[in-house]
């Protein structure tokens, strides 16, 4: 999401790092954990996802203080179908709420496959999106923006 606005907050806690101040390692771990958590609670099969494979991520620019001064890890993965997209969205919504996520837009019938899409934000502003359909499913996560120069390198 080149040129996107700030997506990092500190939840108003005085002892937490402010926007962009967390290390690339911290935000990458949280990003990967959010992917894994969503995969585990999706009800779909994700044959191309491996939480242990951390190589090849090169985060595009994001903005913390000035345009494109940070980096945010992001990816989208494709998975198998779900029999009941509504039930899958309801389950994910309840799960995300239990984790303190803010539930955003929920779309139904977003494509010819009669699927759905649910969007949420973590307490630190990471975007998590789950789109289950009867033909296949998608998960997209856009991590927290970090100013750490280490995030400018492709993960290995």
Regions found by a protein language model. Give the residues of each.
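N-terminal leader/targeting segments
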Residues: 2-68
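C-terminal basic regulatory modules in eukaryotic proteins
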Residues: 27-34, 142-156
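Extracytosolic low-complexity repeat regions of secreted or lipid-anchored proteins
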Residues: 80-144
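Extracellular/mature segments of secreted proteins
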Residues: 68-75, 152-155
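Active-site oxyanion-binding pockets that recognize sulfate/phosphate
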Residues: 21-24, 78, 82
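Intrinsically disordered/low-complexity terminal segments and short unstructured peptides
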Residues: 1, 8, 85, 154-155
């Amino acid at each position: 999401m080149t040129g996107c606005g700030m997506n990092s907050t500190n939840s108003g806690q005085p002892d937490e790092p402010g926007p962009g101040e967390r290390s690339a390692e911290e935000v990458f771990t949280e990003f990967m954990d959010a992917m894994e958590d969503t995969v585990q609670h999706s009800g779909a099969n994700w044959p191309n996802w491996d939480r242990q494979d951390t190589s090849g991520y090169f985060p595009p620019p994001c903005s913390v203080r000035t345009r494109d001064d940070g980096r945010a890890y992001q990816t989208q993965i494709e998975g198998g179908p779900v029999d009941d997209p509504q039930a899958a969205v309801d389950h994910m919504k309840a799960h995300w709420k239990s984790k303190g996520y803010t539930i955003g837009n929920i779309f139904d019938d977003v494509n010819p496959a009669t699927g759905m899409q649910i969007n949420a934000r973590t307490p630190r502003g990471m975007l998590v999106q789950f789109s289950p359909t009867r033909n296949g499913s998608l998960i997209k996560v856009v991590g927290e923006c970090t100013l750490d120069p280490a995030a400018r390198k492709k993960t290995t």
